[in-house]
């Protein structure tokens, strides 16, 4: 998309600009669009996450790949972050679960499509709620949870559980490191023995254990 041309056109303006994610799951491309606008003097920036195109068969129209959105959020925590569950899901039946997941991850808002008569909408009819359904979703079905708590009981319990996770993570990293060393030795042994990288029977045996 022609981000630089848009950035040039917006020079000298004082309007908020929200940058949707690129079609492909490319964090640097998303950040690059934000940086171009920022260099053009656009200071009121925000982002909209609507999922990424994928060749995999998934329940949603677009793949959320939340890890990319979370990474962008961690790098630029000051940016308002909205999620578009309508386009991400591609159907009204997914709007609630995507919306709740977005709020649980701490994103600021949602961009949800609504239409007075969705069946007569010229485009994307399957993903549009009626105004009444939107009202019910926002005020009756979704929950905004606290980001943190000052409760001593909460802090004690969460610190205890996180300490357990830290120990498990250390053990996992050690085990993975040990596995990599053995894998490297196997690779060297195959090379020295003039053996192909892949033995299908071994690969099938590994998959059978999963």
Segments predicted by a language model, with ranges:
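Domain-level signature for soluble enzymes in the chorismate/prephenate branch of the shikimate pathway
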Residues: 146-210
């Amino acid at each position: 998309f022609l981000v630089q041309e848009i950035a040039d056109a917006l020079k000298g303006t004082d309007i908020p600009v929200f940058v949707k994610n690129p079609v492909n799951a490319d964090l640097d491309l998303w950040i690059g669009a934000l940086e171009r606008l920022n260099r053009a003097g656009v200071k009121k920036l925000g982002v909209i996450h609507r999922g990424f195109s994928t060749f995999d068969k998934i329940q949603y129209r677009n793949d959320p790949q939340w890890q990319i959105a979370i990474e962008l959020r961690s790098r630029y925590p000051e940016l308002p972050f909205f999620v578009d569950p309508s386009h991400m899901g591609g159907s009204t039946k997914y709007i609630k679960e995507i919306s709740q997941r977005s709020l649980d991850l701490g994103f600021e808002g949602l961009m949800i499509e609504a239409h007075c008569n969705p069946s007569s909408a010229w485009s994307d009819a399957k993903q549009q709620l009626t105004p009444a359904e939107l009202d019910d979703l926002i005020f009756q079905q979704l929950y905004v949870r606290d980001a943190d708590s000052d409760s001593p009981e909460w802090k004690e319990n969460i610190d205890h559980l996180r300490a357990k996770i830290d120990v498990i993570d250390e053990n996992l990293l050690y085990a993975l490191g040990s596995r990599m060393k053995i894998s490297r030795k196997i690779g060297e042994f195959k090379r020295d023995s003039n053996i192909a990288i892949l033995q299908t029977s071994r690969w099938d045996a590994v998959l059978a254990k999963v």
